Amino acid sequence: MSILISPSDNTGWGLGTGKMYGGARKRSAEHPVHVRSYWRAAWGSRNRRRVATVAAEDAEAPQLEDVAQAPATVPIVRRHRRRVGGSARTRGLRKSARVRAAARAIVRAVNGAAAAAAPTVPASANFAAMVGAIANARAAYRHRRSRAGINPVPASRSTTRVRLPRTVRFHPSMGAFHRRWWRIHTRGRRKASVRRRRT
């Protein structure tokens, strides 16, 4: 049988210590109380808390009005940045299209003048330089291997005439005449290699 305790004690009817909300051991105005098999707010919260809240709101009202009437600093700073030009990162985006078009035309003119002043190199010269670089690389490799004594590569009959890879032999810059000449002059060697493979 539960003990009847007056509600003026902020405990409720027949509320024991183990039946406090959330397992609380000490009674407080923040904890709800168990009344007639359901939890409700603490005793006296319906009137007293509302009065306290209204009083706090009335006390803070002048401060809120001062804050509301204060000028907004962020839009002012943004407006100033926009007028002055902003950061260097976004300054180009704010320039007018006319200014940007003029700057592009100047850059194109400078690049065109630099390209016209540069010496033009024909494709045949590039191909000759590539062939020379391949020959030099092969000669250096052969020399390095023979000096080390590891799998020495015998020198070919002619160091100037180097058999090039197929991609280089049929390079577009060689032209039809050079490709035909290469096929005619290497036909005998190819036939001999085919005969050797068959035997």
From Swiss-Prot:
The modification N6-acetyllysine is found at residue 26. Induction: Expressed in the late phase of the viral replicative cycle. It holds the Pfam family Adeno_VII. Cleaved near the N-terminus by the viral protease during virion maturation to form the mature protein. The record marks 23-24 as: Cleavage. The modification N-acetylserine is found at residue 2. The keyword Acetylation applies. It comes from the Viruses. Keywords: Acetylation, DNA-binding, Host nucleus, Host-virus interaction, Late protein, Phosphoprotein, Viral penetration into host nucleus, Virion, Virus entry into host cell. Residues 2-23 form a propeptide. InterPro entries: Adeno_VII (IPR004912). Belongs to the adenoviridae histone-like nucleoprotein family. Interacts with the core-capsid bridging protein; this interaction bridges the virus core to the capsid. Interacts with host NPM1; this interaction might play a role in placing the pre-histone-like nucleoprotein on the viral DNA or regulating viral gene expression. Interacts with host HMGB1; this interaction inhibits host immune response. All late proteins expressed from the major late promoter are produced by alternative splicing and alternative polyadenylation of the same gene giving rise to non-overlapping ORFs. A leader sequence is present in the N-terminus of all these mRNAs and is recognized by the viral shutoff protein to provide expression although conventional translation via ribosome scanning from the cap has been shut off in the host cell. Plays a role in the inhibition of host immune response within the nucleus. Interacts with cellular nucleosomes and immobilizes the host immune danger signal HMGB1 on chromatin. In turn, prevents HMGB1 release out of the cell and thus decreases inflammation. Also plays a role in the wrapping and condensation of the viral DNA. May also promote viral genome import into the nucleus. This is Pre-histone-like nucleoprotein. It comes from Murine adenovirus A serotype 1. The gene is L2.
